[in-house]
């Protein structure tokens, strides 16, 4: 075969290989022309300004409940109407996360958050029993212990002067999740300069920066940059520590199992000590009930660490900010927290409404995205294979049809009007088959921590401060959460 013929053959083979992708991309372009949406220049300009959420809000007002955005060669169709979101989140076939979640894979691997398809189904079925309320109730004690440390640390700030409370909250959340997820005390609140604490903060910071940076998404280049090297160093610390704890906890479980009396095995497990999330996975592995490698276990523990740390920190901090500006709401929440002290596992209607209203205004996860693997019917649209869809929760929660005067903080919406809302008007924990597996855990931690903080302090606003929510992997305030606090006495009053 001549050189020319060989070159022609290679080019023809390459053409045939990429022809389906080319044809599908052309189909995506034709579909995109039927929907309104911004130019790539507008996207880049708003990313640089860091005002994605405000911009998306403007796009919703300009284009209506459905519009499209090109992220490079990736087409994303945005949905904000509760009926469309019901169709999307309730779809049992639409389970594959979009490319946005690939940013998390270096840390979380193919854990429950990033996985899809049959592998996700098996893992979800395996993990669900670990979030039974009876088991979750065991986690309340370490939540309280770590919140007491937070209360003590805040005493130095209880002088009525403004400060940023977010760093205090995030270290508390890290301590609480380390103890419930891995069964170890990290003392992040007391040793914030430890290697592990620094690594968690570093990886979250780098991933957040990557989330809306085009060039930082290209791993082939990113890994050679300073942030890329920072990420790799943090990953080594995090993975090494999780692997170390897995080995340690397995040895402890084997030793305890050897000491159990066969006829009392069930009771002795609970009597000896509280089981962490990691322990439950290790016991499943040891009993051979499912194929779980140490890497599988590490991925799920790291996933639990990420989801239970960043999202909880955001929710607590925003809740305290809103309560500081709404003293009547804060007083009602304080009275309920005082009346039900020690009974946070029970229903706390008003505090739960406060949490829901906080998550309505500042949802910890501002949007949920999925990859469309087959043509998808949504209302009157047919979204073509190869596109992605995004449920814009931040916009959904501001729909005046379900939430009149949507920027107003009003927990009574969830006490008086909740039954009148569209069932998918509020989706802070997602919904359908891929809803948040840890939402009961999150609510227990939020109720426990907020109740303890409200019983200890009165929260006052910094009148010069207004949080600037940023749409990163988790909604955060770009300028911190500044407020003032005063201590309460035994009667719940302040000086």
Swiss-Prot record:
EC number(s) reported in the record: 1.14.-.-
Cofactor: heme
Keyword vocabulary terms for this entry: Endoplasmic reticulum, Heme, Iron, Membrane, Metal-binding, Microsome, Monooxygenase, Oxidoreductase
Compartment(s) of residence: Endoplasmic reticulum membrane; Microsome membrane
Binding positions for heme per the UniProt entry: 307, 436
SUPFAM superfamilies the UniProt entry points to: Cytochrome P450 (SSF48264)
Enzyme class, broadest EC rank: oxidoreductase
Taxonomy, superkingdom: Eukaryota
PROSITE patterns named among the record's database cross-references: CYTOCHROME_P450
Matching CDD domains: CYP4
GO MF, one annotated term: iron ion binding
Its membrane topology: Peripheral membrane protein
Main localization (coarse): endoplasmic reticulum
Gene3D superfamilies associated with the record: Cytochrome P450
Signal peptide: none
Recorded GO CC terms: endoplasmic reticulum membrane
Family membership: Belongs to the cytochrome P450 family.
Function as written in the Swiss-Prot or TrEMBL entry: May be involved in the metabolism of insect hormones and in the breakdown of synthetic insecticides.
Stated name of the protein: Probable cytochrome P450 4s3
Gene that encodes it: Cyp4s3
């Amino acid at each position: 075969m001549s050189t020319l013929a060989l070159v022609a053959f290679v080019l023809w083979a390459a053409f045939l290989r990429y022809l389906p992708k080319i044809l599908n991309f052309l189909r995506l372009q034709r579909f995109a022309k039927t929907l309104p949406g911004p130019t790539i220049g507008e996207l880049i300009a708003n990313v640089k300004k860091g005002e994605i959420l405000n911009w998306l809000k403007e796009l919703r007002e300009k284009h209506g409940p459905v519009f499209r955005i090109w992220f490079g060669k990736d087409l994303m169709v945005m949905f904000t109407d509760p009926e469309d979101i019901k169709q999307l989140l309730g779809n049992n076939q639409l389970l594959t996360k979009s490319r946005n979640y690939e940013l998390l894979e270096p840390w979380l691997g193919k854990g429950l958050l990033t996985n899809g398809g049959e592998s996700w189904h098996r893992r979800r079925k395996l993990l669900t029993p670990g979030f039974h309320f009876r088991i979750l109730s065991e986690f309340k004690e370490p939540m309280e212990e770590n919140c007491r440390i937070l209360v003590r640390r805040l005493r130095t700030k209880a002088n009525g002067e403004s400060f940023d409370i977010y760093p205090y909250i995030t270290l508390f959340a890290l301590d609480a999740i380390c103890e419930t997820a891995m069964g170890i005390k990290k003392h992040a609140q007391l040793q914030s300069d430890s290697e592990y604490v620094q690594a968690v903060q570093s990886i979250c910071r780098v991933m957040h920066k990557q989330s809306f940076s085009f060039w930082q998404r290209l791993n082939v280049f990113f890994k050679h940059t300073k942030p890329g090297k920072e990420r790799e160093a943090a990953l080594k610390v995090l993975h090494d520590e999780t692997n170390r704890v897995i080995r340690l906890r397995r040895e402890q479980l084997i030793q305890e199992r050897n000491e159990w009396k066969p006829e009392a095995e069930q009771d002795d497990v609970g009597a000896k000590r509280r089981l962490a999330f990691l322990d439950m996975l290790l016991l499943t592995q040891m009993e051979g009930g499912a194929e779980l490698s140490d890497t599988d276990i590490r991925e799920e523990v790291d996933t639990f660490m990420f989801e239970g740390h960043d999202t909880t920190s955001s929710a607590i901090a925003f809740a305290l900010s809103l309560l500081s500006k709404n003293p009547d709401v804060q007083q009602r929440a304080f009275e309920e927290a005082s009346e039900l002290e020690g009974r946070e596992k029970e229903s706390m209607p008003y505090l739960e409404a406060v949490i829901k209203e906080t998550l309505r205004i500042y949802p910890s996860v501002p949007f949920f995205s999925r990859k469309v693997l087959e043509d998808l019917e949504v209302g009157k649209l047919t979204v073509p294979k190869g596109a992605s869809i995004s449920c814009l929760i931040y916009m959904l929660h501001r729909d005046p049809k379900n939430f009149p005067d949507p920027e107003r903080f009003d927990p009574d919406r969830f006490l008086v009007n909740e039954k009148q809302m569209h069932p998918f008007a509020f989706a802070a924990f997602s919904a359908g088959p891929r809803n948040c597996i840890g939402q009961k855990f999150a609510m227990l931690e939020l109720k426990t921590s907020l109740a303890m903080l409200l019983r200890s302090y009165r929260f006052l606003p910094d009148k010069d401060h207004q949080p600037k929510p940023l749409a990163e992997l988790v909604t955060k305030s770009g300028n911190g959460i500044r407020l003032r606090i005063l201590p309460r006495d035994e009667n719940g009053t302040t000086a």
